[in-house]
Amino acid sequence: MNNYKLTIQYDGARFKGWQRLGNNDNTIQGKIESVISEMIGKEIEIIGCSRTDAGVHALNQVANFQSDEKLVEHKVKKYLNQYLPNDISITNVEEVHDRFHARYNSKAKTYLYKIWNEEHTNPFMRKYSMHVNKKLNVKSMKEAAKHLVGSHDFTAFSNAKSKKKSMVREVYSLEVMEEAGFVQIRVSGNGFLHNMVRKIVGALIEVGLGQLDAEAIPQILEAKQRNQINCLAEASGLYLENVEF
């Protein structure tokens, strides 16, 4: 069996997320599977590294699929980019070991979150950032971020859909940056629970607005109560930035 790794970029604004939902084709996975299956002449399933939600974007999503047929990588890339909608782009196709699995073999993921932090709206970024019109205290946000780095039980930063055997995840780094009207948050870790990144960003926004004390973060982690974080950051500002294997 031949195994192929895809590197993918997409604008998630109009899609219902990565994961195919029954017969609903308006997903990233569904669109790519449809084109690959047409190319090969049989039903093909692709496995994505991250099952991004509706409205979330990707700069470097990774997926893989298997085929009985030996394929030429550059021809696959050309075919996919010719027939996929222009808000999905295949940036690389590579034949890999038959045991490579995009989801289970990933060692680290990095997400970037963009907040437009000006009083006025930014019409060009409304689908690609979250607008917070009150000035955020970035210094306090950085202090709060320090408490989230490391290995913790992140139950409080997940939602009810997160029913994993273990809720412990390790955050390798969590940066808060200011740049030309934006506050950007970059988080890297060994894995993330459902909505964990958006809840982390939501908590940092609450800290930045003075609604939550930075020093309360350790107690929130310890309590493991989901209702202690009231802000779920919008999907529009979230980007899957990088995946390491």
UniProtKB/Swiss-Prot annotation:
Assigned keywords, A-Z: Isomerase, tRNA processing
Spell out the reaction equation it catalyses: uridine(38/39/40) in tRNA = pseudouridine(38/39/40) in tRNA
One of the protein's GO biological processes:
tRNA pseudouridine synthesis
Q: Which GO terms describe its molecular function?
A: RNA binding; tRNA pseudouridine(38-40) synthase activity
The record ties this protein, via Gene3D superfamilies, to: Pseudouridine synthase I, catalytic domain, C-terminal subdomain, Pseudouridine synthase I, catalytic domain, N-terminal subdomain
- Residue runs in coiled coils: none
Known EC number: 5.4.99.12
Query: Which catalytic residues are annotated?
Result: D53
Q: List the disulfide bonds.
A: none
Cited InterPro entries: PsdUridine_synth_cat_dom_sf, PsdUridine_synth_TruA, PsdUridine_synth_TruA_a/b_dom, PsdUridine_synth_TruA_C, TruA/RsuA/RluB/E/F_N
Which residues participate in substrate binding? Y111
Subunit note: Homodimer.
- Identify the NCBIfam families for this entry: hisT_truA
Function, as annotated = Formation of pseudouridine at positions 38, 39 and 40 in the anticodon stem and loop of transfer RNAs.
As for family, the record states:
Belongs to the tRNA pseudouridine synthase TruA family.
Note the PANTHER family from the entry.
Answer: PSEUDOURIDYLATE SYNTHASE, TRNA PSEUDOURIDINE SYNTHASE A 2
Q: What is this protein called?
A: tRNA pseudouridine synthase A 2
The organism named in the record is Bacillus cereus (strain ZK / E33L)
